[in-house]
């Protein structure tokens, strides 16, 4: 009997019967997004919906707009690959519409860098969120086209390790006890990472034996979804990005480990409506506290395909801080800016435009406005905004598709910042430390939108190559300057975050400006054409970073340092 079940398991894994599911979400890391983006560019079409991830029915709809007969041989190969990825769906299909999928992925990664002064995840280009777990066990279930659920179990080291060097939040909070708009409730006990073991060491790996460093934050991906051919409702934990940009989106960016969302989407070939509720953690201490406060980031986006060559996204969004949950505020058709209660709400207006000028040539841009002076309003608060513009050229060569791009991004110092309510999220990671200073929850503060927040000036130029058989690679150069503003710095001239955001400087603010250059190349090669089972891929990333401080008064550079960072890995999926 044991031999029978072993043989049956092998047959199931090697010879799956795939099932299509409309409600299935395609992971944000899937290559299908870059493939369909490239196909749209080659077909003289503006980019498809830039709210990602998509459902299977969305991907099928967007791909159906491509005329494969008009594509070159390389384009048709990419088209067929994307079509297979959509149609494959779940691995096994049974009677009465029941289907399921599952597997296990082993990923062994090695990290090397030359300068141990680059010792936090913020100082690495490929940060903790991008590093793969040693083991990922995942499963998906569907009962017909309309229902889908998925979850994973991870074995990986935590975001904080027992061997890290820690400080206390009392050392980095403002004089009135805040980080951003979050009050620090236990500043004398709650630690933060000053120097990370896994980023400090010159040689490291994702293999570890100290179980005290095990990450309890899983599942990292947990999806409950039901929907049809043109609609979907989901309750999910997954990576998310809203907006087209290689530098980073101003609305919601995918640099975070995950986002918890309740999402409703209606879509067709010409219009997509997204209503997204993103619950935000408000606890900042290391202990297991209760809270009477809650926060939700409420997002609604309207995506219009005005012409085949032009798409426009309009979005109005608000973070709502509440102690009493009032259902009236959830109306997705309301204009959030008219709620007019700054102690409870902070709104962000957003617009995005994508234009296909000709075959292979696209231009695009996004603008976010956090704060602007209205008629009859005082000028006590500073304006807060950001924008990015970019262009792409897509063409076929070397039996694949190249996309060359160049982008510029500028954010004002106080973008995402305000007293009371702001656009910062707090993610707490549980840690089994060996002493009282590191045992419990460790909070990490991040911007929901652009990774580096306000007070930044960034240029990025690069190239992406997608091959239908072997995978894809990317290389780029990024130049950035960052002023004095940070998550830990007060937005108020008196250093009190309970008071209004009134710093009046322009980007880059302060006397000393951080200037950085990044040169990066990364890629992943699939061996599926050589070996159909198990799925094996080899990947790597090499980054060179140069950082210095520029003094605006005396025009001098100081504290120049560099680091070469190398990540190599192999994944085996069964």
What spans do the regions from the language model cover?
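Outer-membrane beta-barrel "beta-signal"
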Residues: 525, 561-574
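Signature for the C-terminal beta-barrel architecture of outer-membrane proteins
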Residues: 232, 241, 253-441, 454-461, ...
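Sec-dependent signal peptide recognition
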Residues: 2-10
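C-terminal structured "cap/appendage" subdomains that terminate the fold
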Residues: 512-541
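Outer-membrane beta-barrel channel domains
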Residues: 23, 27, 42-50, 54-311, ...
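N-terminal signal peptide c-region/cleavage motif recognized by signal peptidases
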Residues: 14-16
